[in-house]
Regions:
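Nucleotide-activated donor-binding/catalytic signature segment of Leloir-type glycosyltransferases, i.e.
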Residues: 248-275, 280
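Nucleotide-sugar-dependent
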Residues: 220, 269-274, 283-302, 311-321
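Donor nucleotide-sugar binding/catalytic pocket of nucleotide-sugar-dependent glycosyltransferases
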Residues: 33, 144, 148, 161-201
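Conserved donor-binding/catalytic core segment of Leloir-type glycosyltransferases
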Residues: 4-6, 201-220, 225-230, 238-239, ...
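Conserved acidic donor-binding segment of nucleotide-sugar-dependent glycosyltransferases
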Residues: 326-335, 342-349
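An aromatic- and histidine-rich active-site surface loop
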Residues: 56-58, 90-100, 115-134, 329
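N-terminal subdomain of nucleotide-sugar transferases
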Residues: 1-63, 170, 227-233
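Membrane-proximal helix-turn-helix segments that form the acceptor-binding/catalytic region
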Residues: 34-39, 123-126, 130-135, 143-171
C-alpha cells in the first residue's frame, strides 16, 4: 500500500543536525513519535513523507528553509520550503505543501494511496485535506493531543483546528478521549504509543543520579519534582534535561542546590545515555482526569523501553499493566514526590532492575513497532477499502 504522511517529522539524522544548529530548540517529542510511526508504517508499506519542518523567526541564521528530497532506507522524505514571514504563512504555505505532495504522488507512479496527517498543524492539515480531495483518496488523522491543551495559539485557532480535523475518514489516536474531542462517530484505532530499540549510548556513570528529560512545564510536574528533591534528604543527584518556561527556575535551583544538575536540551544520543545510566528515570506528570483522557505521557513509555527503573505518577491507562514493575508516586503533591524519592532504596537496585527488565519486555509486547504495525495496517486497509464500496 502507498501511504503519504503529512508531518513535521524528518529523517532522524536530519533532525539531529537541525536541532544542533537551531538557536531556538524544538521540542523533540513530536519528531520522536512521528518518526516511530513512520518506521512502523514502512514495515509493510511504501511510505513517503511530506515534511513541513518547524520554523520561527530567530531559529536559524537564515529565515527560510530550502526544499529537498532524501531517502531513509526505503522511506522518502520530501522537505518543503518554509519561510518565517507572515505573508508566506498566510498566502503561500498551504500551496507549497500541496505542490510538494504532488511531487511525492508523481513518484508513487500511482494515484492509489492513502493519506495520514498530523492534526495539530493547521496549514499542514488543510493541505492534506486539499490533496485528498484533488485525488479522491481517503485521509486519516493522527490524534496526539487536544489543541486546547497546547501552550501556544489562540482559542479561535484551536477551535478552528478541531473543526478542520473533525471530518476526516478515520483516526489513529493515542487515547479514546481524543476521539471524543474530534469525531466519536468516525472509525478509529487507539494505541497509547510506540517503542523501538534505541542505540546503546552506554557509558559508565560518574555519579548516582535520578533523571528527567523532557519539556520543562509546571503542568507536567517538573516544578513539583525539583521542589520535592530540593526539600528531600536524598544524597544522590537529580539531573534535569530539556527546554521550556521552567529552564530559568531550574538553573537557579541548580545554583542553590549542588545536588541538582541542569543540562538544557540534549541530543537524542545523550538523552538515551543519561536514561540508561540513571538510578531511576522519573515521570512527574500529575494525575489530571482531563489531561489523562486526552494525552499520554510519552516519556513514560520511553523510560520503560530503556530497561532502567522508573518512578512515576499513576497514569491510569498504564497502571494496571505495569502495577508491579514501577515505583509509583501516590499523588500530585510535593510531599508525595518527596516521599517517593526518599524511599527509593538504592541498596536494593538489583531488585529494581529486575522489575525494569520485566517492564521492558511488557512494553515491547504491547507497543513495539512490529506488534503495532499489524494492527495499524489492518485498520488502514479497512479505511482504504471503503473507498471501493
Amino acid at each position: 500500500m502507498n501511504i503519504l504522511i503529512f508531518s513535521n517529522a524528518m529523517k532522524e539524522q536530519d533532525f539531529a543536525l537541525y536541532q544542533s544548529e537551531a538557536k531556538i530548540k524544538p521540542n523533540p517529542s513530536n519528531q520522536n513519535f512521528y518518526y516511530k510511526l513512520i518506521k512502523t508504517l514502512a514495515i509493510n508499506n511504501n511510505v513517503s513523507v511530506v515534511s513541513h519542518r518547524p520554523l520561527v523567526k530567530g531559529m536559524f541564521r537564515k529565515n527560510y528553509l530550502e526544499g529537498d528530497t532524501v531517502f531513509d532506507g526505503k522511506i522518502k522524505f520530501y522537505y518543503t520550503t518554509n519561510r518565517c514571514d507572515k505573508v508566506f504563512k498566510l498566502l503561500k504555505e498551504k500551496s507549497v505543501i500541496v505542490k510538494t505532495a504532488k511531487q511525492a504522488i508523481d513518484d508513487f507512479m500511482s494515484e492509489d494511496f492513502i493519506i495520514i496527517t498530523d492534526t495539530l498543524r493547521l496549514n499542514l492539515l488543510k493541505a492534506a485535506k486539499k490533496v485528498a480531495k484533488l485525488y479522491d483518496t481517503k485521509i486519516i488523522g493522527m490524534l496526539t493531543d487536544n489543541p486546547f491543551n497546547l501552550s501556544s495559539g489562540s482559542a479561535f485557532v484551536k477551535k478552528y483546528l478541531v473543526e478542520q480535523a473533525s471530518n476526516l475518514d478515520g483516526y489513529l489516536s493515542l487515547t479514546n478521549g481524543l476521539v471524543e474531542v474530534f469525531n466519536s462517530s468516525a472509525p478509529s484505532y487507539v494505541f497509547e504509543g510506540l517503542v523501538c530499540e534505541e542505540s546503546e549510548g552506554k557509558k559508565d556513570p560518574i555519579f548516582n543520579y535520578f533523571y528527567f528529560g523532557g519539556s520543562l512545564y509546571e503542568r507536567y510536574g517538573v516544578k513539583t519534582l525539583v521542589d520535592a528533591f530540593h526539600k528531600s534528604n536524598v544524597k544522590n543527584k537529580l539531573v534535569i534535561a530539556g527546554s521550556g518556561p521552567l529552564a530559568e527556575y531550574i538553573e537557579q535551583m541548580a545554583e542553590d542546590d549542588y545536588r541538582i544538575l541542569y543540562l538544557s536540551q540534549l541530543s537524542k544520543e545523550k538523552n538515551i545515555a543519561y536514561m540508561r545510566n540513571s538510578i531511576a528515570n522519573i515521570n512527574p506528570r500529575p494525575l489530571d482526569p482531563k489531561m489523562d483522557n486526552e494525552s499520554v505521557p510519552s516519556k513514560l513509555l520511553e523510560y520503560l523501553s530503556i530497561g532502567t527503573p522508573v518512578i512515576s505518577t499513576k497514569f491510569p491507562k498504564l497502571f494496571s499493566t505495569f502495577k508491579d514493575d514501577i515505583t509509583w508516586i501516590e499523588g500530585n503533591s510535593i510531599e508525595d514526590m518527596k516521599y517517593a524519592l526518599e524511599h527509593y532504596e538504592v541498596p536494593n537496585q538489583e531488585e529494581y532492575l529486575k522489575k525494569a527488565a520485566t517492564a521492558r519486555r511488557k512494553v515491547f509486547e504491547f507497543y513495539g513497532l512490529n506488534v503495532q504495525a499489524e494492527s495499524i495496517d489492518h485498520f488502514i486497509a479497512e479505511i482504504n477499502s471503503s473507498t471501493k464500496n
